[in-house]
Amino acid sequence: MSLMVVSMACVGFFLLQGAWPHEGVHRKPSLLAHPGRLVKSEETVILQCWSDVRFEHFLLHREGKFKDTLHLIGEHHDGVSKANFSIGPMMQDLAGTYRCYGSVTHSPYQLSAPSDPLDIVITGLYEKPSLSAQPGPTVLAGESVTLSCSSRSSYDMYHLSREGEAHECRFSAGPKVNGTFQADFPLGPATHGGTYRCFGSFRDSPYEWSNSSDPLLVSVIGNPSNSWPSPTEPSSKTGNPRHLHILIGTSVVIILFILLFFLLHRWCSNKKNAAVMDQESAGNRTANSEDSDEQDPQEVTYTQLNHCVFTQRKITRPSQRPKTPPTDIIVYAELPNAESRSKVVSCP
């Protein structure tokens, strides 16, 4: 079945046939779906191909079906060129993966690199599944939450979407339990609520989904500062890189401050110990000089011959003798004894 195309912002279109042009000459454009890539049966979706490169022509191609390549003349506004492809009413043959290309007038067979792929899914074809939350739709901030999508239909895959999110999370259905097939979506600790829906699909038709489940509003009690991870992201995340850098910087500053304080304290201690040692050395030198003076009594042993009789007495140093000189004339003679000095006194 050929596509029914209505241009919303461009003039004219025609179906390309013949050889495929050369790709990758220009930078790739972007491809968006309005209002979204999940399209209910019989509804219409707008696929917009745009670029900041001034393309005169845009081509829309659905993978796997070469005959469904469409061409539109681009429209230019504020440095942006774009073309809007209207696809609808949506049927099973129109679902699939789309890419778009851009080209210029002087080289129409030299195309840009292809845009990133965009999957267009038709919904509303089968019975809707049920969606529930464990432990419940109202939880405390930080409490772990698991959403369960189940149905009596033997769907191979279940898809969970969150309102406002561009992509969905999918899980294979588990074994049949009590007449139902189920898939569990662990969301991790809750920090912020949201509205969720789930769909079922079969393995041989991945772009054809069931009706959506009834919306499930998950509410979080509290005033969390962070958003709840989307179902397409892991529930456990690392911290904010900026906060991590701040934490590392603070730790480094604290460590440097502690090291500086330790070095300053050690320097002051060494200086104080050096002053004490200098004082002790000076005291020791003073004490040693006093001990030397005390150990040298400067005593002299004399032998006096009085009236030709030898007597021995101890005479103090001259500074300690009486000031009145003796009447006798005394003659001294040194003896060779090193420890004591002997004097020979001759009688007149």
Curated annotation (Swiss-Prot):
Membrane topology term: Single-pass type I membrane protein
Family matches, as CDD domains: IgC2_D2_LILR_KIR_like
Segments traversing the membrane: 246-264
Gene3D superfamilies to which the protein is assigned, alphabetical: Immunoglobulins
Any Pfam family matching the protein: ig
Chief place of localization: membrane
Domain Ig-like C2-type: 42-107, 142-205
Protein name: Killer cell immunoglobulin-like receptor 2DL2
Leader peptide range in chain numbering: 1-21
Domain of life where this protein originates: Eukaryota
Taxon lineage: Eukaryota, Metazoa, Chordata, Craniata, Vertebrata
Disulphide bridges: C49-C100, C149-C198
This protein's record includes keyword Signal: yes
Entry GO terms, CC: plasma membrane
Residues carrying covalently attached carbohydrate according to the record: N84, N178, N211
SUPFAM superfamilies in the cross-refs: Immunoglobulin
Ranges in the topological domain labelled Cytoplasmic: 265-348
Record topological domains on the Extracellular side: 22-245
Subcellular location(s) per record: Cell membrane
Family: Belongs to the immunoglobulin superfamily.
Keyword annotations: Cell membrane, Disulfide bond, Glycoprotein, Immunoglobulin domain, Membrane, Receptor, Repeat, Signal, Transmembrane, Transmembrane helix
